[in-house]
């Protein structure tokens, strides 16, 4: 060691080429070692969400940022920590037109967090809420922060119409719906997400009656879950104030009660008239809502004397051809399982976001997983799909629904051919 120390101290000119190379390699190894610290364990200490409102329904008077504030405040209160402990926040939000600058900043300050709290808004289309959790986890793992808030928010009821800037043409102007333009259209093939779902249904030979049956099952499961109190630990009430009228308190999801099973098989297909399979009943709906989780390192949980609900085990992103987005979660989920050395049989519960019934059926088919373990309390088809929120909602739901020691895997597709997946373990 004394010889090595002398070599490192000696001048470069006094060394032979061989010695110079040896010194460089020693310093490289030294540098590589110190740049790879042990990652910190990340735990979930609370997970809350607002009820999900129907399009132009019970929550339509509240912007996404207000819904986000309510979810964030609820999560911090459930965690039982001072707001000053939250060092940073990430929130998913897709349809930001007309919301004003920095939506996450609005949500965080609206929740009463300190002015000094850094905020970032994430847009990965429907995977935004989950990606926010993933990015917060990375920051916690590497020790950059020790307590964070992450989640997602969306108010599809408040998304504006737009027109192109420029001189007004003869004959009038054309307004475009930003829900469709920025949220539900495959920009590469210039088709609606539902047309992409039809393409996958054809490729995998998934018939309409299978999708209808799945949708009915989703509504049935959601109703049973609400009646059994399965959502009680995650949903916080929202008070809606209307000038000159009594306040309205929204306590439960609105969408799952708005179904007539007798009409499901009779509905016309939406995106493909001949031999189509996707209908308004077996697809998710347009909705409003927000979800938030308080994440922290295991060390921070000990310092703050809070009991973690679950730990984040692994996560991954994947991407396929844009038109094939419904099957992208298959690859993200497979990557997660491979990374941690688990088998699909080791997963007690799966949450596969129900953008369309087709998406879940395709993932069940390709992964060869037990349908009885998938979306056991319903999903986006029956509960609703506020697109920036859903990725956070399904992670939060697993956090409460799993039993101690069980693994749960949440996955969600996103426009452009992407997907995200996250594995958690109940503590």
From Swiss-Prot:
Active site at 126 (acyl-thioester intermediate), 413 (proton donor/acceptor)
- InterPro entries documented for this protein: Thiolase, Thiolase-like, Thiolase_acyl_enz_int_AS, Thiolase_AS, Thiolase_C, Thiolase_CS, Thiolase_N
PTM N6-acetyllysine: list the residues.
66, 174, 181, 190, 202, 223, 230, 251, 257, 263, 273, 338
> Per the record, where is site Increases nucleophilicity of active site Cys?
385
Record comment: activity regulation: Activated by potassium ions, but not sodium ions.
Q: Per UniProt, which keywords does this protein have?
A: Acetylation, Acyltransferase, Disease variant, Fatty acid metabolism, Lipid metabolism, Metal-binding, Mitochondrion, Potassium, Transferase, Transit peptide
Please report the PTM annotation for this entry.
Succinylation at Lys-268, adjacent to a coenzyme A binding site. Desuccinylated by SIRT5.
Q: What is the effect of changing residue 183 to R?
A: In 3KTD; no activity
Check the record and name the Gene3D superfamilies matching this protein. 3.40.47.10
PROSITE patterns from the UniProt entry: THIOLASE_1, THIOLASE_2, THIOLASE_3
GO terms for MF: acetyl-CoA C-acetyltransferase activity; C-acetyltransferase activity; cholesterol O-acyltransferase activity; coenzyme A binding; enzyme binding; identical protein binding; potassium ion binding
Q: Which Pfam families match?
A: Thiolase_C, Thiolase_N
Q: Which residues form the signal peptide?
A: none
Q: Give the transit peptide range.
A: 1-33
* Protein location: Mitochondrion
One Gene Ontology BP term is:
coenzyme A metabolic process
Residues annotated to bind CoA: 219, 258-260, 263, 284
Q: Which disease shows up in the entry for this protein?
A: 3-ketothiolase deficiency: An autosomal recessive inborn error of isoleucine catabolism characterized by intermittent ketoacidotic attacks associated with unconsciousness. Some patients die during an attack or are mentally retarded. Urinary excretion of 2-methyl-3-hydroxybutyric acid, 2-methylacetoacetic acid, triglylglycine, butanone is increased. It seems likely that the severity of this disease correlates better with the environmental or acquired factors than with the ACAT1 genotype.
PANTHER family in the record: ACETYL-COA ACETYLTRANSFERASE, MITOCHONDRIAL, ACETYL-COA C-ACYLTRANSFERASE
The molecule here is called Acetyl-CoA acetyltransferase, mitochondrial
* Lineage of the species this protein comes from: Eukaryota, Metazoa, Chordata, Craniata, Vertebrata
């Amino acid at each position: 060691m004394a010889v090595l120390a002398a070599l490192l101290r000696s001048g470069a000119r006094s060394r032979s080429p061989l010695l110079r190379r040896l010194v460089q390699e020693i310093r490289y190894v030294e540098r590589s070692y110190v740049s790879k610290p042990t990652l910190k364990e990340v735990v979930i200490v609370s997970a809350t969400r607002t009820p999900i409102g129907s399009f132009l329904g019970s929550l339509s008077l509240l912007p996404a940022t207000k819904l986000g504030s309510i979810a964030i405040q609820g999560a911090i209160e459930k965690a039982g920590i001072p707001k000053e402990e939250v060092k940073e926040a990430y929130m998913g939000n897709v349809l930001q037109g007309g919301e004003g600058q920095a939506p996450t900043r609005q949500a965080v300050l609206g929740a009463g967090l300190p002015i000094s709290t850094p905020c970032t808004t994430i847009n990965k289309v429907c995977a935004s809420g989950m990606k926010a959790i993933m990015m917060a986890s990375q920051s916690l793992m590497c020790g950059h922060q020790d307590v964070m808030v992450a989640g997602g928010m969306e108010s599809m009821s408040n998304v504006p119409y737009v027109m192109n800037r420029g001189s007004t043409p003869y004959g009038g102007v054309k307004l475009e719906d930003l829900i469709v333009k920025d949220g539900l259209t495959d920009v590469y093939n210039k088709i609606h997400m539902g047309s992409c779902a039809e393409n996958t249904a054809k490729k995998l030979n998934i018939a309409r009656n299978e999708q209808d049956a799945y949708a009915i099952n989703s509504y049935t499961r959601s109703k049973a879950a609400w009646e059994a109190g399965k959502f009680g630990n995650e949903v916080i009430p929202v008070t809606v104030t209307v000038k000159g009228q009594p306040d309205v308190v929204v306590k439960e999801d609105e969408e799952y009660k708005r179904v007539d099973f007798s009409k499901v098989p009779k509905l016309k297909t939406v995106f493909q008239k001949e031999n189509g399979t996707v209908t308004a009943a077996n697809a998710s709906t347009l909705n409003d809502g927000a979800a938030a989780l308080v994440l922290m390192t295991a060390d921070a949980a000990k310092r703050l004397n809070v009991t973690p609900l679950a730990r984040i085990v692994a996560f991954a992103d994947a991407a396929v051809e844009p038109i094939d987005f419904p099957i992208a979660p298959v690859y993200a989920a497979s990557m997660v399982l491979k990374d941690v050395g688990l088998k699909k049989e080791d997963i007690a519960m799966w949450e596969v976001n129900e953008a369309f019934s087709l998406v879940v059926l395709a993932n069940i088919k390709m992964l060869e997983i037990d349908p009885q373990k998938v979306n056991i309390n319903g999903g986006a088809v029956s509960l609703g799909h506020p697109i920036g929120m859903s990725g956070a909602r399904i992670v939060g739901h697993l956090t409460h629904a799993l039993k101690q020691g069980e693994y749960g895997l949440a996955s969600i597709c996103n426009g452009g051919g992407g997907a995200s997946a996250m594995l958690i373990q109940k503590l």
